[in-house]
Amino acid sequence: MSVGILRARSRTAARRLHPGLRQPLAVVGVVIVAAWIVLAVFAPLIAPADPLEQTFPASVGPSWDHLFGTDELGRDVLSRVLYGARVTLPLSLLVVVLAATVGALVGAVAGYFRGPLDGLCMRSTDLVFAFPPIILAMVVAAVLGRSLQNAAIAIVIVAWPPYARIVRGLVMSVGDTEYVQSARLLGASARRALVRDVLPNVAGPVLVLMTLDLATAILLLSGLSFLGLGAQPPQAEWGSMVAVGTQYFQWWWMGTFPGLAIFTVVVAFNFLGDSLRDVFDPQTSYRAPEE
């Protein structure tokens, strides 16, 4: 397989990207994610009150004064949901980027050099895969201590192996092509071959997995906070807000609105991930109707 063929495939994927993202579910995902990003960025201007302020009547239902009601301490729920987005979204993105970076590096090294190093890397992924992700994340977070930062570290430890597996397989496939073998014979260093010739060809599948993993990271981060292993009071975070809401079922709005925030963001990233997978997977790629 020549360099020209691989570049042609990359151009083909780029051409498919636009019509692929015009699918209805992709549009819905983009709109929801964009809306939440805007709300998170401008939360200080949009929020009607300070998320930690306790000067309002406690446990008041939704009204014109408090669209999402107030919680058990008299804090405005809408303000806390908006500020919770400023915590959950950037931290989830950071977690996914770190996990993808670690996993891609491990997978690239294992797939390119192979041999004993490949075996060591893959056994490390097997060790992580042996445990359910939420259980392993709970154990790591509990050992490190209860904080949002430690919860993020725990999720990175859980999330990197899939990237290593995917990148390893793709690197081994691309590494056997004629142009990579020719680069080796011409004396190209391993670093140059990986960075210039191999990794660009695995970017598509990694991007798809990162988009889908954003939804998983949000769920895990919220789940750990729900269990008391992530965000600690009085910080505004969606998972911890849902946890408090479960203690007051008669005041349904306290847990419902942060739960809806989690639901909408997770569904939106899943829509985006599925659409990107259609773009980069030739077997399920989107095809525009013929005129």
How would you label these PLM feature ranges?
Residues 24, 72-291:
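Alpha-helical transmembrane segments of integral membrane proteins
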Residues 1-34, 272-291:
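Transmembrane alpha-helical segments of polytopic membrane transport and secretion proteins
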Residues 27, 66, 268:
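Conserved beta-strand and immediately adjacent loop positions that scaffold enzyme active sites
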Residues 22-25, 56, 64, 221:
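A structure-centric signal for secondary-structure junctions around beta-strands
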Residues 18-23, 63, 176-177:
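Serine/threonine-rich low-complexity intrinsically disordered regions
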Residues 31, 35, 39-73, 227-236:
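Hydrophobic alpha-helical transmembrane segments of membrane transport/permease proteins
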